[in-house]
Structure formats: structure tokens, C-alpha cells
């Protein structure tokens, strides 16, 4: 006689830790071996919340929906400005494409619901990128699967209940991650709660070429890659071709569909209407050799023989108030505009003829859409290294860490090498993908309309939920 015995359900913390660490982390990224179907009744959100709520104090969901609206939860972290920018671009695209059909919430799950180090990632990241050797060690040191797998499993053990609370607060119909550390723990939680694939989970990668391995998780419904190079990395990391889409980097809709006239923009921004303009940036934090490059540009863009400028400069200092104050107190040979943190970059880019910037993916993608030839003057080790060949090899710009040489290149483009400037501009436009953000939200909309289907789950996860008697 066969007797069925109901085994008590372990807590989410024990299940995650046991499943991931039970084999010393060896099965963390094994090939997907089993299928999971979520179409049957039973379990699901209510049951999961009632069980874990009694144990871990997880509140009932309070995300309210209108009669027809679907909730979209976008997970991000302010480790650099690109993740939030992509999240807000997706939010705006949902609103433009589908109106009130979706309610979109952009949340930093680690900061709002996690403890240390999740709630301290922004400060830690800013510290490390100011000490680039430290960041380089952190980036490459956590690349092996067993290293970041153990690290994320430990975080899941301590903060799983908090993550459950954060996710269920918004009662999401779709979850989007735009950060490499926002896949693993939420996916573990969803699978434990029997909500995946009923709740589609998609990743939107915000690095153009060089990606940290934590971007790639086998359990996602879809992985949106900004370039063919990233798609190749996704395949090498074990994702199936059916999970991968290559649409480009999501950029604010104001960049994608606004038709801006350069002459009108220069009039609006109080710029010289006749002089070519170079845009100098250092990212949201005003990093890199911005001051040195601005000084060199002031010298190189002044024709001493004719005693007149051959170009003008726009400097975006971001949140770096010290840099802005220093530049405002300097004397210049040519017209200069010095700005702080800008929310209307599409206007400043539309008014300029080329750009000098560090190799941030968002700035590169925006410059390509505007057809701006790019001079890359710096990069963050790790995720931005591959952005340099992405620009240079595609003929959209050049790389020079020397501020004086970068300034000379601009002077040549504005005087004797104008044909070269036009060629780089055309190549930039060819590389641009202005509709990427709309293509992504349209594809997510199609996913949401599909019924729950069979999805494959890593063996390590399913094995942790199985008990032999």
C-alpha cells in the first residue's frame, strides 16, 4: 500500500539556501532540466502570502489596480545613472504606447526593502568608481559563477522575506529588471511562490558590449539585449535563442521621436547660431578629465591668427558642483555654456555637432540617435571597456584619453576635416536604434497577453522543493 505524506513546506530562506548551497554551489547554473507549468489552480499568491506572512511577517499586497490596468514593476538601483534612465524610459514608453492600460512603478528594491549591503549599493558604487582599481577587482572578482552565486544566495537567505514584501506590495503582472543584481533573488522568490511564469519576468540589459555575468539568468521570460555582441554573451551564458531579443538600448522617448531643428535649439539655448559646437560631458557625476578638456578646447578652438573663435563649447557638469563652480570662475577664449545636471539632454545634443564623453552606454546611445560623432575620453573598467570598440570599430567616433589631442580632433573637425565629421555623423545614425524602447514595451505587452506556458527552471531550484519520503 502506498501512503502519501504531506511534507511541511520549508521557509523560503531555507529552501533558497538549501537549493543553492546543498551541492556546494555546483548546481547553481546547471543546464535547465525540468519543466514547470503554472496553469493549475492551487497555491499561488494567496496561499504563499498566508504561509510566509505567518512566518516572516510579509504583508498582504497593497498594489491597487484599476479594472483593466496591469501593474508593471521595474527593478533598478542607482549604481550609475544609466539604470534609472532606462527604467524611466520604459515607464514613459508604456504610457505613450498604452495609456492607462498599465501602471508602472520604478523601484530600488534593495534600498527600499533590503538591508546591508543591498541598501548601500549606491554609495558603495560611487566610492569604488572613484577608486577604479578597486572597482576593477570587484567587477572581475565576482564574475565566476560560483562566486556571485554564493553571494546572491547569502543575500537571498537574509532578505528573501523583505523581497517578497517589496514585490507583493505592487501586485505586479509584469516584472522588469534593468540591473544585474535584480534578477536572481526576485526570480527565486517568484518560483518559490509559484508565480513564475504567470508573472513574466524580463531583463533589459543596459550595457552595450561588456556585461557582468549576473545580467544573464536562465529563468527569465525574455532577455532584451542592446547589441548583437551582448546577445552572443547571453547565448554563451546558456540562455536559449527564444529568450533573447536584440532591439537596442532603451532611451527616453524625447530622444526617439522628437524632431528638433538645430537653429531653433541654438536660439532657445542662447548659443551662437553660426559657430559649430562641441558638447563635453562626464556622466551624471561629472567624472573624468572634464576641466582639462574644457581648457584645451578653449585654446584649440580659438584662431589666434584671425583672433576669432572657430567653435563653441557646452559643458555638462552633472551633479559635480565643485567642477561647475571651478569652470564658471575660469576665463575662456571662445563662447562657453556651463550647465549642471540636465534633464533635457536631447536639446543640448541637438544643438551640438560632436561630443566628448566617457564611455557610458546611455550617453553613447543618445549621441548616436542625434548623429553626433563621439570622442571617448575615459571609461569605467569592466562594464564600459567594450563600449570603446563598439563606437570606434563602427566608425562612429574615436578614442583619446589625452585632453589636448581630443581638443585638436574637434578643431580639425570644425575647420579642415569637415567631411570626416560628416562621415562619422552618418555612421552614428546608421548605428542608432531610436525605436528600441518602443520595440521592447510592445514585445512585453505581447508577453503579458499570452497565457501561462511551460517554462524551464534550473534543476537546483526544483530539487530544493522536492522531498523524498
UniProtKB/Swiss-Prot annotation:
InterPro entries attached here?
Answer: Diacylglyc_glucosyltr_N (IPR009695), Glyco_trans_28_C (IPR007235), Glycosyltransf_28_UgtP (IPR050519)
Q: What is its main location?
A: plastid
Subcellular localization: Plastid, Chloroplast membrane
EC number(s) per entry: 2.4.1.46
* Keywords for the protein's UniProt record, in alphabetical order: Chloroplast, Glycosyltransferase, Membrane, Plastid, Transferase, Transit peptide
Where are its TM segments located?
A: none
**One term of GO molecular function:** 1,2-diacylglycerol 3-beta-galactosyltransferase activity
Task: Give the residue range annotated as the organelle targeting sequence.
Answer: 1-42
Query: What does it catalyze?
Result: a 1,2-diacyl-sn-glycerol + UDP-alpha-D-galactose = a 1,2-diacyl-3-O-(beta-D-galactosyl)-sn-glycerol + UDP + H(+)
Record's GO cellular component terms: chloroplast membrane
Q: Which SUPFAM superfamilies match?
A: UDP-Glycosyltransferase/glycogen phosphorylase
Q: What class of enzyme is it?
A: transferase
GO annotation, biological process: glycolipid biosynthetic process
UniProt record similarity statement: Belongs to the glycosyltransferase 28 family.
Q: Which PANTHER family match?
A: MONOGALACTOSYLDIACYLGLYCEROL SYNTHASE, MONOGALACTOSYLDIACYLGLYCEROL SYNTHASE 2, CHLOROPLASTIC-RELATED
Function noted in UniProt: Involved in the synthesis of the major structural component of photosynthetic membranes.
Q: What is this protein called?
A: Probable monogalactosyldiacylglycerol synthase 2, chloroplastic
Q: What is the lineage of its organism?
A: Eukaryota, Viridiplantae, Streptophyta, Embryophyta, Tracheophyta
Amino acid at each position: 500500500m502506498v501512503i502519501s505524506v504531506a511534507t511541511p513546506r520549508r521557509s523560503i530562506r531555507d529552501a533558497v539556501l538549501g537549493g543553492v548551497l546543498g551541492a556546494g554551489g555546483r548546481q547553481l547554473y546547471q543546464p535547465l532540466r525540468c519543466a514547470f507549468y503554472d496553469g493549475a489552480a492551487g497555491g499561488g499568491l494567496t496561499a504563499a502570502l498566508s504561509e510566509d506572512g505567518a512566518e516572516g511577517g510579509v504583508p498582504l499586497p497593497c498594489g491597487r489596480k484599476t479594472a483593466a490596468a496591469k501593474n508593471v514593476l521595474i527593478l533598478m538601483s542607482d549604481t550609475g545613472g544609466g539604470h534609472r534612465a532606462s527604467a524611466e524610459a520604459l515607464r514613459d514608453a508604456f504610457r505613450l504606447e498604452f495609456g492607462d492600460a498599465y501602471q508602472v512603478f520604478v523601484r530600488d528594491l534593495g534600498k527600499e526593502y533590503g538591508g546591508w549591503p543591498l541598501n548601500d549599493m549606491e554609495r558603495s558604487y560611487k566610492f569604488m568608481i572613484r577608486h577604479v582599481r578597486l572597482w576593477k577587482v570587484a567587477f572581475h572578482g565576482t564574475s565566476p559563477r560560483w562566486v556571485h552565486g554564493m553571494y546572491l544566495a547569502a543575500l537571498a537567505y537574509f532578505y528573501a522575506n523583505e523581497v517578497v514584501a517589496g514585490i507583493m506590495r505592487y501586485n505586479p503582472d509584469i516584472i522588469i529588471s534593468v540591473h544585474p543584481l535584480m534578477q536572481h533573488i526576485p526570480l527565486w522568490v517568484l518560483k518559490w511562490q509559484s508565480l513564475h511564469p504567470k508573472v513574466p519576468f524580463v531583463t533589459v540589459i543596459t550595457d552595450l558590449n561588456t556585461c557582468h555575468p549576473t545580467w544573464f539568468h536562465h529563468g527569465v521570460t525574455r532577455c532584451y539585449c542592446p547589441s548583437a555582441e551582448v546577445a552572443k554573451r547571453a547565448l554563451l551564458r546558456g540562455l536559449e535563442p527564444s529568450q533573447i531579443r536584440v532591439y537596442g538600448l532603451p532611451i527616453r522617448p524625447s530622444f526617439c521621436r522628437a524632431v528638433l531643428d538645430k537653429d531653433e535649439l541654438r536660439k532657445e539655448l542662447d548659443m551662437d547660431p553660426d559657430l559649430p559646437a562641441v558638447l563635453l560631458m562626464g556622466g551624471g557625476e561629472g567624472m573624468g578629465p572634464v576641466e582639462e578638456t574644457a581648457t584645451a578646447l578653449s585654446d584649440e578652438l580659438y584662431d589666434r591668427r584671425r583672433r576669432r573663435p572657430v567653435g563653441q563649447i557646452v559643458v555638462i557638469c552633472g551633479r559635480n558642483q565643485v567642477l561647475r563652480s571651478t569652470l564658471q570662475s575660469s576665463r575662456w577664449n571662445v563662447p562657453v555654456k556651463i550647465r549642471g545636471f540636465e534633464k533635457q539632454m536631447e536639446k543640448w545634443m541637438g544643438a551640438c555637432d560632436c561630443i566628448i564623453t566617457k564611455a557610458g552606454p546611455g550617453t553613447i546611445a543618445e549621441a548616436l540617435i542625434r548623429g553626433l560623432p563621439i570622442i571617448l575620453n575615459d571609461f569605467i573598467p569592466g562594464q564600459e571597456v567594450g563600449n570603446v570598440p563598439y563606437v570606434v570599430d563602427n566608425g562612429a567616433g574615436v578614442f583619446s584619453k589625452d585632453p589636448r589631442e581630443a581638443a585638436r580632433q574637434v578643431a580639425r573637425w570644425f575647420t579642415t576635416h569637415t567631411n570626416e565629421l560628416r562621415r562619422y555623423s552618418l555612421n552614428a545614425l546608421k548605428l542608432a536604434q531610436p525605436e528600441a524602447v518602443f520595440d521592447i514595451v510592445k514585445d512585453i505587452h505581447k508577453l503579458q497577453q499570452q497565457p501561462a506556458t511551460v517554462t524551464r527552471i534550473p534543476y537546483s531550484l526544483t530539487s530544493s522543493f522536492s522531498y523524498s519520503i
